[in-house]
Design a protein with these regions (language model features):
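Conserved P-loop NTPase motor cores
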Residues: 1-108, 133
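Conserved P-loop NTPase motor module
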Residues: 1-13, 17, 82, 110-148
Length: 148
């Protein structure tokens, strides 16, 4: 895939130039639909930090990711996860996979926007990221179409 090779080439070029790269993949579940892209992503997920890069994946619904053994390995081996509101089936799978208690999962059950759980290494912390809705920063950061 041209896109994946372009990402890899950019990370390599930035490393040579002494620049840090942050690769952000929205709708990451799409990478797990096909064997080649899933394997590529897994390789990058494990190696890019050695090349001065960080990988971030985002998806609305993790159920599609959790159907992939490769994605499950990536979730389980990630040192930093942000969990926002989750569907019931997703909560159950994530709780099992990540060893998160039912009480802790309560923070991603019917959670308001910007509320959830942070999993950092072996620690799990609830958070509420509330930001004033007025102002330019909110407008820039908001992913809600009506807020633009």
């Amino acid at each position: 895939n041209v896109t994946m090779e372009t990402i890899q080439n950019r990370v390599a070029a930035n490393r040579l130039a002494g620049n840090y790269t942050w690769v952000f993949l929205d709708e990451i579940y799409l990478f797990f639909k096909y064997y080649y892209s899933a394997q590529f992503l897994y390789k990058c997920w494990k190696r890019f930090r050695k090349y001065g890069a960080a990988m971030t994946g985002a998806t609305q619904n993790v159920e599609e990711c959790l159907r992939s053994d490769t994605a499950r390995l990536m979730f389980a081996n990630s040192e930093f996860l942000v969990l926002l509101n989750q569907a019931a089936t997703d909560r159950a799978e994530l709780a099992r996979l990540l060893n998160i208690s039912e009480t802790q999962m309560g923070h991603v059950t019917g959670a308001e926007a910007g509320h959830g759980l942070l999993r950092i290494g072996g620690s799990i912390v609830p958070f509420a990221n509330e930001f004033p809705r007025s102002g330019e920063l909110y407008r820039l950061w908001s992913t809600t179409p009506g807020d633009k």
